Design a protein with these regions (language model features):
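A well-structured
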Residues: 1-289
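Accessory "access/gating" subregions that flank catalytic or transport cores
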Residues: 289-296
Length: 296
C-alpha cells in the first residue's frame, strides 16, 4: 500500500513541515508584501512563492474540511475547521487583495508572456474589482453556515431491520431486487430528511440572504451574476447557461424519458418510482465494493 502514496512536491518558500496557524504563516505574507520587484525575474519568482504559499494553505484547509465532513461529531476536528475559517481565512482575504494590488502595480507585469499570463492577469483584475472589505466577515459566516449543513446531514441516520445506518449506507438497499424493501427504505430515508426540514429551510434562507448581501456590496443585482465574475467565468454568461438548459430539456430529457420507459417495461412496471432507478434490471444482486485497502 505504501507504493500508492503520491510523493509531496518539494517546497522552496515554506518549510516542508509547518504547523498552519496565522502566527506561523504571517511572516511569509509579510515577505511577499515587503519584497521589492525590480526585475522581471524577481516578479516571476515572487509569483512562484505566492503560489506555493497559497497552495499549502488551500491543501491544509481542504484536509480540515474533509476530516470535518467525514466525522461531524468530533469536536477537535470541528474546532480546527472553524479556526481556519474564523482566524486565518479572513486575514488571507485581506492579504490576497493587497498582494493582487502589489502585482498589478508592478511595472514588469505586462512584460510577462501574454499567451501564458493573460488569463491570470484578467483574473487578478476582476478580483480587485469585486473585492469589498465588508464582505470578508460575511464570507466567514457563510463558511460556518455551510458547515452547519454538513453537520445536520451527517447526523442523519435511519434504522433498518433493527440496525442503524447513515443515509449513505442505507442507500445501498435501493439496489435490492426486492421492490418492497426498496420502497420501505426510500420512504424511511425521505422521512428522516423531512424531520430536519424546518432547520434546513431556515439555514438555506440565511445563506440566500448573506449571498445576496455579498453581491449587493460588490455592486451586483444578484449572487449569480457576482459568482460568474468571482469564479472567472468570462467566456460565457448566464444567458448561455439558460440556453444550455433549454438544449438539455429539448435533446437530453426525451432520451432519459425513453430510457426510463424501457427500464419500467423490463421490470414489468407501469410506472417507475424513485426507488426503481438503481436496481439492476437483469436481476443481478447489487455489487459489493471492497471494504478496505487489502481487498482493493
Amino acid at each position: 500500500m505504501n507504493n500508492l502514496l503520491i510523493p509531496k512536491k518539494e517546497r522552496h518558500f515554506l518549510p516542508n513541515t509547518i504547523e498552519i496557524n496565522w502566527k506561523t504563516i504571517l511572516p511569509f505574507f509579510d515577505d511577499l508584501m515587503n519584497r521589492e520587484l525590480i526585475s522581471l525575474g524577481e516578479l516571476t519568482q515572487w509569483m512562484i512563492d505566492r503560489s506555493e504559499l497559497e497552495s499549502v494553505l488551500e491543501e491544509d484547509f481542504a484536509w480540515r474540511y474533509i476530516r470535518m465532513t467525514c466525522d461531524t461529531t468530533d469536536e477537535k476536528i470541528l474546532k480546527a475547521f472553524e479556526d481556519f475559517a474564523t482566524n486565518i481565512e479572513p486575514k488571507l482575504a485581506e492579504y490576497a487583495n493587497l498582494l493582487n494590488q502589489k502585482i498589478m502595480d508592478c511595472e514588469f507585469l505586462y512584460e510577462l508572456p501574454a499567451s501564458e499570463y493573460f488569463i491570470y492577469i484578467r483574473s487578478l483584475k476582476k478580483q480587485l474589482e469585486i473585492f469589498r472589505e465588508e464582505n470578508i466577515s460575511i464570507f466567514t459566516e457563510l463558511q460556518l453556515a455551510q458547515q452547519k449543513y454538513g453537520a445536520i446531514a451527517g447526523a442523519m441516520s435511519v434504522t433498518i431491520e433493527d440496525k442503524e445506518y447513515t443515509l449513505e449506507q442505507a442507500s445501498t438497499f435501493l439496489k435490492d431486487q426486492d421492490r418492497n424493501i426498496r420502497k420501505t427504505v426510500y420512504e424511511t430515508i425521505q422521512a428522516r430528511r423531512l424531520k430536519d426540514r424546518n432547520q434546513l429551510d431556515k439555514l438555506f434562507n440565511n445563506l440566500i440572504a448573506m449571498r445576496q448581501q455579498v453581491a449587493s456590496n460588490a455592486g451586483f443585482d444578484n449572487f449569480r451574476d457576482y459568482q460568474f465574475q468571482a469564479l472567472g467565468r468570462f467566456d460565457y454568461n448566464a444567458k448561455d447557461c439558460l440556453a444550455f438548459h433549454d438544449a438539455i430539456a429539448k435533446e437530453v430529457v426525451p432520451i432519459l424519458k425513453s430510457n426510463s420507459l424501457k427500464r419500467a417495461s423490463k421490470m414489468g412496471l407501469n410506472n417507475l418510482s424513485p426507488f426503481d432507478t438503481e436496481v439492476d434490471i437483469t436481476g443481478k444482486a447489487a455489487l459489493k465494493p471492497f471494504a478496505n485497502g487489502e481487498e482493493l
